A protein has these predicted regions:
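Extended, low-hydrophobicity, polar/charged segments
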Residues: 1-152
Length: 152
């Protein structure tokens, strides 16, 4: 499903955004930055988390790290990263290709302010060798994300 679900989502909601597929893997921030000719911080990585029984996605700059204190202050509890099998189950995307587009079921999505220093960011597009270039504000708008400050 993954890449195709992202393609279907973009065709329906943002037909002007093109998926970029690369021959090489872009499954890590460093590989993605190299493949797309941007600095690592401009890669929009999607982190899959559980807070109690609630699952959520946080999209952050590629070099940003989740700050446990900020996260707890914002959400009232500590986050737990999901394992690879859980990630695929809730997003349909493999680790290294996770993005906030084309999800099988709605999830709360948050964009960290670490993305705001860029006009354009590069999130994955549902596979380990695909991505899109998207204006930062439009990423939040398309996914219905709320802005948070939970990274350092």
């Amino acid at each position: 499903m993954s890449l195709e679900s992202v393609r279907a989502f973009l065709n329906a909601h943002a037909p002007d955004i093109e998926i970029i597929e690369t021959a090489e893997s872009s499954s890590t921030v460093a590989l993605a930055a190299e493949a797309h000719g941007v600095e690592p911080a401009q890669i929009a990585k999607t982190i899959c988390l559980r807070v109690g029984e609630q699952m959520m996605l946080v999209v952050a700059g590629g070099t940003a790290r989740l700050d446990n204190r900020k996260f707890k202050d914002t959400f009232g509890a500590k986050a737990r990263m999901l394992g690879a099998e859980e990630v695929v189950a809730i997003t349909s995307h493999p680790v290294g290709g996770v993005c906030p587009f084309g999800l099988p079921s709605p999830l709360p999505i948050y964009c960290d302010i670490s993305l705001k220093r860029f006009d354009e960011v590069v999130p994955a597009a549902g596979s380990t060798n695909s991505a899109v270039r998207i204006e930062t504000g439009r990423l939040a708008e398309l996914t219905g994300a709320s802005w948070v400050d939970v990274c350092q």
